[in-house]
Amino acid sequence: SQDFTVFGGSLSETFAEKICKVMDLALRNGAPLIGVNDSGGARIQEGVASLGGYADIFLRNTLASGVIPQISVVLGPCAGGAVYSPAITDFIFMVRGVSYMFVTGPNVVKTVTHEEVSFDQLGGADVHAGTSGVAHFVHDSEPACLAAVRDLLAYLPQNNLDGAPSRHVDGPPSDSPNRREERLLDLIPDSSNKPYDMHEVLRLVMDQGSLLESQ
């Protein structure tokens, strides 16, 4: 995690070593990796050493890809190197009015292009969920966001050697696994060129209340 109250959450050489150690432990033990991102990027006072720390983090992101689940929770304004790592993780959670992701902030954009843009227009949660496609989940509050992270973990295996988790669902009698859904016969059209609502198919096939939709 990154603490914005300490040097704006910027990455120093020592801070990068701490993050890399946690990532190594997650890989060694086959445990999901959850990052709480709230950082302004590299600590410019340390120069190249800080940038080298990002290289070490990115390397571990790629080594962990497909091995353990990697989840990024963006809970503040993140810029520069602080957004490259989340962008190559498996899932990104953002909060409206709180989370921002951009390579450079609005002030730099104004200086270079003379165009005025707000934080939300440049890298807000809705922009990344609806336009860039970077964010997978968007919520209106931090507690709701963190609760959703816990919900997602219930659907994921611990690592690539672990089986998919299963759980008992206390649904109504109408939600029996042996039920027949006659509506499926009419819902899916005969023509492969005719569209239909996939959400309705999923709701009929899956256990009630078990559908978790990702962007």
Write out the residue ranges for each language-model feature.
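Non-catalytic terminal/interface segments that mediate subunit docking, oligomerization
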Residues: 1, 23, 27, 193-215
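A structural preference for short, pocket-lining loop segments at secondary-structure junctions
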Residues: 1-3, 18-44, 215
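Flexible beta-alpha connector loops of hexameric P-loop NTPases
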Residues: 5-14, 45-51
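Short charge-dense sequence patches
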Residues: 8, 95-105, 200-210
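Conserved catalytic cores of soluble enzyme domains
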Residues: 37-161
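Terminal amphipathic helices with adjacent charged low-complexity linkers/tails
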Residues: 137-202
